[in-house]
């Protein structure tokens, strides 16, 4: 994506809404405001756009319910507030989306869920299945069980990692600012808004400041970091004011709202770089001529029936190569099954996986979305 003209072509979008927008000045959830974003998301769904909602607000809502005026610093108190507030947050979204005939699903994640390869695949598979079913996944950090070592730190980062996982076309971060400004607008009200920039533009570092609300964990600098993280998988980011009327449909229509941050690589190139440079090969599937031809010519998923040998020892989520019988690498990808499981189901049709293993994770050994040609 290189310009706003391409935004109307987005088919999968991550929308992140921060605490400062979701709460009514620290007095609990702002139901009317949340209702407006829910209505906008419903409009996007009517256009066939898949939407994942990453929502802050559980700690802020918990603080309100517990009568706390300032955000606590102790982790156990934050976790207690999150536990109390998450109830209200989920109930609110479920009720409001139901008015539009939409089902919601709650997903609470920790950093481990997206850094561990096996759990990453499980999380990704669940989210994609929900999207296929027309459900709106509502994702938040699992504050109740996280420790300092496994916290995302802010939901901007969580939104970016979810965008990476599901290969979203666009990450929209709604905030209490109109976007990125050339100078701090709190100090210089005449500072111009930056409508668009390349994600690696060195000037961006001088443009970010801190949010003033005190309810959330992330200032503008975390939003820029999140945009850069999303860009690693080729996802563009728009940072815009959540208080702008009809902001979500207007952004997807290509209107110049907020700041568009453009990735420097396409999603396919980004994924190839990631698999080539960040992951270590753990094994190999040797495939027959038919599977080799399908992989080379069509880039389709690798099915168990096309595998004639399994080399190495690996677990679900590891990177494995696909080679022909002569040892020529055709592709590489993330396996849905361990080496032990793969040896049991190779040469077999996918319909027999459950019969052989007693369960079925996926019908493919490697799904085409997790496969890149060599």
UniProtKB/Swiss-Prot annotation:
Residues 282-360 form the PUA domain. Its EC number is 2.7.2.11. It comes from Methylococcus capsulatus (strain ATCC 33009 / NCIMB 11132 / Bath). The gene is proB. It is found in: Cytoplasm. Pathway: Amino-acid biosynthesis; L-proline biosynthesis; L-glutamate 5-semialdehyde from L-glutamate: step 1/2. The keyword S-adenosyl-L-methionine does not apply. NCBIfam families: proB (TIGR01027). This is Glutamate 5-kinase. Pfam families: AA_kinase, PUA.
